[in-house]
Amino acid sequence: RWRFICCLFLFAVAISVSAQAVKKTKMVKIETTLGTIKVRLYDETPLHRDNFLKLVEESFYNDVLFHRVIKDFMVQAGDPESKSADSTARLGSGGLGYTIPAEIKFPELYHKRGALAAARLGDMANPERASSSCQFYLVQGKCFTDQELDEVEHRLNMVLRSTVPFKYSEAQRRQYKTFGGTPHLDGQYTVFGEIVEGFDVLDKISAVETSKGDRPKEDVKIISMKVVKR
């Protein structure tokens, strides 16, 4: 009997922990002028998660533009200077006066299609790969062949110089071959979330005409962001 009661207690604890994990999962709805995207934030990157949520709660992203759009690559937003920018302004250097320490959890978190990642300055100016306080990008990417992924692995191993050579898992290869992404960015930028709804909107944004500096000819704006339950 005591064994039965103990099992019931452990089961109840497991259910409670599972429920708490689900409850803590943070989702953000991004309303844009081209539709709605919903993203899930990763608990594995708490500094980026909490910073993003703070800015969302403060309505920081309201009226911010997608100022850099490259088809088959990514769409970037979050520059506060874009809120009041005219059509000739060069954007992408704005921030909030601080950076976020890198939380690069590669290979667990990688640049698959729909990945949400933090923008940052290049390695020369930023060898620690600290992230922008507010700028982020969403990966559209493209599909890759096994040969192309082999080449990416080779380049990554040149950079990582690990005693155990890196290889993409079968699941990761399948993701990159079937759905796409930007594997050449893996291990270099912090991926802190992913799209769960609105891939069609990502594709709409990626398809807009752009001018010099990859800025859309017609503004694509974030109307609002809101934390949602699921």
Named regions from a protein language model:
Residues 1-6:
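Bacterial N-terminal signal peptides that target proteins for export
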Residues 7-9, 82:
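A periodicity- and composition-biased signal for non-globular, repetitive helical segments
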Residues 9-18:
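Hydrophobic h-region of N-terminal signal peptides that target proteins for export
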Residues 17-230:
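Cyclophilin-like peptidyl-prolyl cis-trans isomerases
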